């Protein structure tokens, strides 16, 4: 399981699995139902990281689990209706994403490239106006999972960097929280 997000309707969870999207119920007993896959012919690709936006859409990234040098990953949008689509292909290691509190823009990491991208989200859920938000050096570590707080500050976990860093919306680092581990993958608050 790469991620687990509570459904807006309170009816269980959505999950990201090796095999694709799934609906999960914990009660009265564990039950898992497939909910679609954007990579049925690519057994080495798996869902990796995801976030839900204020409209109940889940933005999920995928990666080649066997060879991350291959740009077989993608960023997909799973709609509340259950339909999904790949919104960007050609990604190595999809991490993040982080969605602005007002839902108007999103950040996404391609960890293999040490690069964070920014997109504007249109009213109908399309990603447009892609720009490079920030490129990190090898010494800084690899940008992995991330989130935004209610003020729109960006928090990124750094694999190999042993820390979580806070950035303003323009990408200027505000602070660093060092942790007693090197492989930090994500955070939640």
Language-model features: locations:
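A short beta-strand motif characteristic of beta-propeller blades
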Residues: 1, 33-40, 82-89, 129-136, ...
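Loop/turn-rich, solvent-exposed surfaces of beta-rich toroidal or solenoidal domains
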Residues: 114-119, 126-130, 134-172
């Amino acid at each position: 399981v790469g991620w687990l997000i509570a459904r807006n309707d309170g009816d269980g969870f959505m999950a990201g699995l090796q095999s694709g999207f799934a609906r999960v119920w914990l009660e009265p007993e564990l039950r898992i139902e497939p909910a679609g896959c954007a990579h049925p012919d690519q057994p080495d690709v798996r869902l990796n990281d995801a976030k839900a936006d204020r409209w109940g859409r889940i933005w999920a990234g995928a990666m080649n689990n066997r060879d991350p040098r291959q740009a077989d990953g993608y960023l997909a949008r799973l709609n509340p209706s259950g339909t999904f689509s790949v919104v960007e292909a050609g990604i190595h290691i999809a991490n993040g994403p982080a969605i602005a509190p007002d839902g108007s823009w999103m950040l996404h990491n391609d960890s293999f490239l040490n690069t964070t991208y920014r997109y504007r989200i249109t009213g109908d859920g399309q990603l447009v106006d892609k720009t490079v938000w920030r490129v990190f050096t090898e010494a800084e570590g690899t940008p992995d999972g991330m989130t935004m707080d209610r003020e729109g500050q960006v928090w990124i976990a750094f694999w190999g960097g042993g820390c979580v860093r806070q950035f303003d919306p323009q990408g200027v680092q505000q602070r660093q929280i060092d942790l007693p581990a090197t492989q930090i993958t994500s955070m939640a608050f």
